[in-house]
Every structure is written in C-alpha cells, then in structure tokens.
A protein has these predicted regions:
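Symmetry-related core transmembrane helices of the 12-TM Major Facilitator Superfamily/SLC fold
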Residues: 167-184, 388-404
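Helix-to-loop junctions at the C-terminal end of transmembrane segments
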Residues: 63-76, 159, 281-293, 379-380
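Cytoplasmic helix-loop-helix junction between adjacent transmembrane helices
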Residues: 107-145, 343
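C-terminal transmembrane helical hairpin of 12-TM major facilitator-type secondary transporters
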Residues: 295-340
Length: 422
C-alpha cells in the first residue's frame, strides 16, 4: 500500500475533487435519462413520442464527440467541460416551460449533447491525471456507479413531492456541485501551444477562436487513424461488444422479464444488482492488470458477459438464477471497463486522451442506437427468445477477430505510449 501511495501521480495528491466529478458527472446524465420520460408522461405524450425524446439525446454525441474531445486536447479538458456543464445548468429551467413535443425534442438534443460532453470531460481528465493507471480509473468508475445509483432515487423522490419544477431545479443544483468539483480538480497538461501542465511557471492558454467551434475533417481523420494502433482497435471492439450487452439489457431483457410476470420491483432489484457489483468490480481492475494478461482478461470477461445476458431465456425464469447472472455480469463489466480505459490511455499518449474518449463515446452511442432496434426486429420476426440466441451468437462471432487484434497489440508493446502530438 505504501508503494502505491508513493507512486500516486502528483495531480492526485488530493483525489477527492476528481472522484467527485465521476460521481456527479455520470449521475448528471442519468438524472435526465430518468426524468424526461416522467415529464413527457405528465404532458400526456404517446409512447412513440417518449421514445423519440429519449433517443434524441444521442444525436449530437454521435457526430460531435470526436470534435469535442479534440477541443479538450487543444484547449484544456476542464475548461471545455465547464462550458458544457454550464450549458446544461442554463437549459434545465427551460424544460418545464416547454410542454410541446418539437421544442422539447430540440431542447433534449442540445441538453443531451451538453450532458454527454460534460461526462466525456470527466473521463478524459481522470485518464490524463492518472496517466492511464487502471487502479485509479477503477476507483473513479466506482464513484461514477454510485452516482448512477443515487441519481434516479433523488430525482424520483423530488418528482413525487413537487413535480417538474422542483425536479429540474435539482438538476441546476446538481450541475453547480459538479462545477465546484471541476473547479477544484487540477487541469491536465495539454498539447504544446496551449497551457502548460500544473507546476509550470507559464500560464498561457491556447487562444480560442470562433472557427474552432466548427468540426474539422482533419481532426476526424487524425482521430480515426488511432484505430491503426492495435491496442486502440482491440479495446474499441471490446467496448462496442460490452455496450451491445447493455443495449440488450435496456431493451428486450425488460420485455422478457415482463413476459415471465416479474414485477417492476423485482426487475429493479436485478438492475440495481448489476450496478452495485459493477462498482465493486471496478475496485479490482488495478489488481487484475497486474496479476494477469490484460488483453486476455478483457476478452474473456467480455465473452462471459455476453453469454450471461444471452442465456437469460434459458434460466427458467428463476429469480435467483437471474440475480446471480446479473451479479456475475456486473462484476465482470466492472473489472473490464477500467482496464479498457487504461489500455487506451497508455496507447495514445497524454495529448490525445480527449480524442480517444471521443472515439470511444462515438462507438458507445452507435451501439446504443443500433442494438435495440436490431434485436427488436429479430424478436418480431421470430421470438424474444430467438433474439437472445441470434444476437448473442453474432456478438460471440465478432470476438474471433479480436483475438488477432490482441496478438497484434502484444507484438507492438501496448504499454509503450504512442508518439506525442506536436
């Protein structure tokens, strides 16, 4: 333990602020994910309209996550993150003022982007400050999971007590707390030409110009070129498969559980179980990086996670078995996620953390958009049970080429940082 404290990055001498950004940042996004269906239902909107509103938050992150990540690398992660957190704070009181579908959808698109980019900033900042250390990334993920657990409870209770206005004003307060955490967190080094890292005598910021708000094709090309790094390609593929399992859970998994007559409370217990065990598993990620082969651990953990979610129809509807499957899957995902982040962070170098987080967020949003409708189409064509089998088999087949990527990553010494950007 003494050696770990001695080896702690200087920027984490007091890690409370950066861990707090994890708790509040991820919880901030989940706060609105939970709130928008409640608000739309109170306005009498149809299920189709609610579905469109829920999905609208993904629109900007799909196209702009890479651009925002590059801005973080160029102008400072904390600086860019604060802008989007302040944007979300300013938009929160507008929700109760807009009871119409189209204005609400436009607001949801912009606010969803702001929340996503703010959370990306927290992920980028911890990767920069920890230099990709899986143990600290795991602790950050642990606190983030706490945020996702308490946010729905808080907003649900406030909604029951006072409705839309108090709930969205709590969103303002949540954003202000996140602002304080970011202001107390240290800024990381940015690329040459921007502000130097903490401890340098010079305090020069890169000058922001209006044209910097526009995405550049060259930035996207440079970002996608990171996929040429075997470690990045391998971890992006694993991250897509991991999120595909989550896409199954948030779509037809719930449908299946309702078909076997589980109550809403029971389903909630299953969802809480995976969040809790995922948080606990995150604390083991650093040790897993040290005691085993990280690449093989990530692949085997992802394969087992896919098997556990796709085996749902074959558990006989027995609650104990369903619970054990969720506990095991949560633990595996909790261990694997910080390892993925760590391998990526070490592979790309300190000045491209925002870009790789943006690339990862793009893959995340794509899997969230693609998997539920594909699975729904399979269920409509055959059955819900068949959709688990067909999609599960396809996802497992996708793991085969990852073995080749793992071998390439090992051959290219993924622990060595990529050349620094100039």
């Amino acid at each position: 333990m003494t050696n770990r404290v001695a080896d702690r990055p200087a920027a984490l001498a007091n890690p409370v602020a950066i861990y707090t950004t994890g708790l509040l940042g991820m919880g901030y996004a989940d706060f609105y994910i939970f709130l928008i269906p409640l608000y739309a239902l109170s306005l009498g909107m149809s299920a189709g309209e609610i579905g469109v509103l829920a999905g609208a938050r993904h629109l900007l992150p799909v196209f702009l996550s890479i651009h925002v990540g590059v801005l973080m690398d160029r102008f400072g992660t904390r600086r860019v993150s604060l802008f989007f957190v302040w944007l979300a704070i300013s938009l929160a009181p507008m929700f109760p003022l807009l009871p119409w579908f189209w204005p609400l959808m436009l607001l949801q698109i912009v606010n969803g982007g702001a929340l996503s980019f703010g959370w990306s900033g927290s992920q980028t900042l911890i990767a920069q400050l920890t230099e990709g250390d899986a143990e600290y990334l795991g602790r950050f993920n642990f606190f983030a999971r706490i945020g996702t657990t308490i946010a729905p409870i808080v907003v649900g209770g406030v909604w029951d007590l006072g409705g839309a206005w108090p709930a969205y004003l709590i969103g303002v307060a949540w954003g202000m707390l996140l602002t304080l955490a970011l202001l107390r967190a240290p800024e990381a080094q940015i690329a040459p030409g921007g502000r130097p890292g903490v401890g340098h005598s010079e305090r020069r910021w890169a000058r922001f110009q209006l044209r910097d708000t526009l995405p550049r094709v060259s930035d996207y090309i440079a970002c996608f070129s990171l996929v040429a790094i075997p470690a990045v390609a391998m971890t992006l593929a694993l991250f897509f498969l991991r999120n595909a399992g989550n896409g199954i859970q948030f779509s037809l998994y719930v449908v299946y559980l309702k078909q076997i007559n589980l109550t809403g409370t029971t389903i909630g217990v299953l969802f809480s179980a995976i969040e809790i065990t995922s948080a606990l598993g995150s604390l083991f990620a650093g040790r897993a990086m040290r005691i085993g082969d990280p690449q093989r651990t990530m692949l085997s953990g992802t394969v087992l996670s896919i098997l556990l979610i796709c085996a749902t129809p074959f558990l006989g509807g027995v609650f104990v078995l369903l619970l054990l499957a969720q506990v095991a899957r949560g633990w595996l995902q909790g261990v694997v996620q910080p390892m993925i982040f760590s391998v990526q962070a070490k592979a790309v170098g300190r000045y491209r953390q925002g870009a790789v987080v943006g690339l990862r967020q793009t893959m995340n949003r794509l899997s969230s958009i693609l998997i539920p409708p594909i699975m729904g189409a399979i269920a409509d064509w055959w059955s819900v049970t068949a959709s688990f089998v067909v999609l599960g088999g396809f996802l497992l087949l996708m793991c085969i080429p990852i073995v080749r990527l793992i071998r390439r990553a090992a051959a290219s010494a993924i622990a060595e940082e990529a050349p620094e950007a100039t």
